[in-house]
Amino acid sequence: MNDVIRDFFKMESAGGILLVIAAAIAMTIANSPLGETYQSVLHTYVFGMSVSHWINDGLMAVFFLLIGLEVKRELLEGALKSKETAIFPAIAAVGGMLAPALIYVAFNANDPEAISGWAIPAATDIAFALGIIALLGKRVPVSLKVFLLALAIIDDLGVVVIIALFYTGDLSTMALLVGFIMTGVLFMLNAKEVTKLTPYMIVGAILWFAVLKSGVHATLAGVVIGFAIPLKGKQGEHSPLKHMEHALHPYVAFGILPLFAFANAGISLEGVSMSGLTSMLPLGIALGLLVGKPLGIFTFSWAAVKMGVAKLPEGVNFKHIFAVSVLCGIGFTMSIFISSLAFGNVSPEFDTYARLGILMGSTTAALLGYALLHFSLPKKAQA
């Protein structure tokens, strides 16, 4: 396993632990006498946007920039480079997004407001999933880790497309025009083989602001910037893409994602009823994550292998695939992010119950996925 992937697993596993701590602290504060202060700080305006807005639209754009970098690297020289290696996790990812969405729709088809949250259980939290699998150390085959990484990256890319197509507000033509021009400039820099990162960051900042004002979610600017960064440097230079990827990892894993979790997982349980907690919305999300994810990933994976379209990675069997598919039911940060887009400005009550459904489904998936991996993997570490 090359250094990039090894460093990635190491970073994300530690980051996953921080996510749990940040979420637990947020829940504790939100349900303590400091709850009002917590909400007040998040809704304090700084430079025209609330602190919460800066975190969700600003800092999360950096997270999506990292996703863009990772996807591009995997497409050009990693697990997604060839059809043979990409087809299996790609098919699994499609099933893993389709089945949870269908389960959610089945539960909420009769509620015109709740139905907009259909994409919430379709997401996988890559930091949490990799954090859990890292707890099992060298017992986990490298090929299984690469499968999970590729699946999660394709899943993230699917979420990006969903946000762009289904969670976009009223559009500003002028802002969109500026955004398209800046996108063109970014790829022109790439075509001209500009390897210095500063020009990309300056143009990228303008792109982010334009997208923010356009009605399209600002985080998508991060993905565009990531795809524009060149993989290869000039002769004798390091890869600009890999350099930026390594530079961003600690800030994203140890800063941005835990901060996002802290800002979004603080759910006040005041006024939450058992009838509300067991209503169609949170149940649709929890079961979408806990049942839909493994059902979709495992079924599509099994069918792809049986039909001869793809083959299992070396050293991996269907017990491992099922365990990983359960682990992919950890939606957490990505699901909360989509919930904020679906319900944040429409129904705070729906958003609260959606987040509780996410926490229920994700926590159960994490525990069950770990247990299944623990019992299905070899007792001794892989050589």
UniProtKB/Swiss-Prot annotation:
Catalytic activity line of the entry: Na(+)(in) + 2 H(+)(out) = Na(+)(out) + 2 H(+)(in)
Annotated TM spans: 14-34, 47-67, 87-107, 117-137, 146-166, 171-191, 205-225, 252-272, 280-300, 321-341, 356-376
Example of a GO MF term: sodium:proton antiporter activity
GO biological process annotation, one example: regulation of pH
Described purpose of this protein according to its UniProt entry: Na(+)/H(+) antiporter that extrudes sodium in exchange for external protons.
Membership in a protein family: Belongs to the NhaA Na(+)/H(+) (TC 2.A.33) antiporter family.
Protein name according to UniProt: Na(+)/H(+) antiporter NhaA
Organism: Vibrio alginolyticus
Lineage of producing organism: Bacteria, Pseudomonadati, Pseudomonadota, Gammaproteobacteria, Vibrionales
